A protein has these predicted regions:
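Alpha-helical assembly-interface signal, strongest on the long, hydrophobic N-terminal helix that forms
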Residues: 1-51
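Extracellular/periplasmic head regions of type IV pilus-like filament subunits
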Residues: 37-76
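Extracellular/periplasmic catalytic domains that process cell-envelope and extracellular macromolecules
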Residues: 61, 99-103
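Charged, often glycine-rich, active-site loop that binds/positions anionic groups
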Residues: 73-90
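A short hydrophobic beta-strand element
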Residues: 80-85, 104-114
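Short, P/G- and charge-enriched loop/turn segments at secondary-structure junctions
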Residues: 92-100, 123-128
Length: 145
């Protein structure tokens, strides 16, 4: 029971680290820095990994992080789909930078498949196959003029 409590606490802390890192990396899009530098998906993932490396094993292996950046025109309904289907992380995921100064709404999502170790004795918080828990962070914003 003690190990389950510790694992749950670490999981919640890791979720907060991912939220903060995603918010800071998404700010690069909100303030035009990503657009001005032509930041591609790999560069965005690298920036995010540099911000969360204290808790996450994604530095040097960007496959552990999945990002989804979608741009919505003003007045358009924002539809976000559940990334988990039948215990697997599924897309479609995209990466599209908003035009600088556009009135569009941008939604940035970051996902990390966190491995779980205490999954027996009736305590199993996995929501992915392979005893993993999907950690997700979302930032939504309008690009600064």
């Amino acid at each position: 029971m003690l190990f389950a409590i510790l694992e749950t606490g670490i999981l919640f802390f890791a979720g907060q680290v991912l939220e903060q890192g995603t918010a800071e990396s998404a700010r690069l899009m909100m303030t035009h820095q990503a657009q001005d530098s032509g930041m591609n998906e790999t560069a965005f993932k690298t920036d995010l990994c540099n911000r969360i490396k204290v808790m996450f094993n994604c530095y040097g292996n960007l496959a552990n992080i999945t990002v989804d950046v979608k741009v919505f025109s003003p007045g358009t309904a924002i539809t976000i789909t559940d990334p988990i289907v039948s215990g697997n992380l599924t897309g479609p995921f995209s990466y599209s930078l908003p035009p600088a100064g556009s009135p569009n709404t941008v939604v940035v999502r970051a996902f990390y498949q966190w491995p779980l170790y205490v999954t027996r004795f009736g305590y199993n918080i996995s929501n992915l196959s392979g005893s993993k828990r999907l950690l997700a962070a979302t930032a939504a914003f309008h690009v600064e003029p």
